[in-house]
Amino acid sequence: MMQRWVLLLAMLVSVAGFALNHYASQSPDSKSTHTSQSEFSAERAFDLLARLLGDESPHPVGSAENARVKDEILTWLAEQEIDATVQQAWGCAHSGSRCAWVENIVATLPGKHNGPYVALMVHYDSVPPAPGAGDDGAGLAAVLEAARLLKASGPTQYPVMLIITDAEEAGLLGAEAFFKQHDLRQQISAVINIEGSGSSG
């Protein structure tokens, strides 16, 4: 009798654990584009991703389509009244075997204090055979929606920087150019890099 009770209890705990795990792993419902401007909206980010991707052509570094994506990002940042500049520089791999002319977008949001920046980093170029929706378009759209929210919510404690690099797929060349050459590179206390890591999970 005791063994049956223990077995039943173990089964009940297992089922409850499975149900709790299943519930905890569910994504929350996404917020619509009509959600308050003071909240993050996945649907707003998805709409922005569609705008950035255009006709879904690949946009590797140096291509006309990559220039279009860059201009679309700059237009969107201007619409949000977020200050942005373009760093134009040669970016080279450590070995010097690969170099490219890169156009990184650097945007800043002021904070209540003048302390170092917290940087959100993402890239906008794609690999040559794909439009880059997952790597790194979705990350880019999420970072831009987060920036919109931060701007709408008023200043954060410390300033925030968006580092939107070019030529990531060619070997992190945009990041190399930023961290070796940009005037603000030593005014950053933390970097949160948002990178595509596949589309299967």
Predicted regions and their residues:
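N-terminal capping segment at the start of a domain
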Residues: F18-K70, Q80, Y124-S126, S199
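A non-catalytic alpha/beta surface segment that caps or lines the substrate-entry region
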Residues: A50-P110
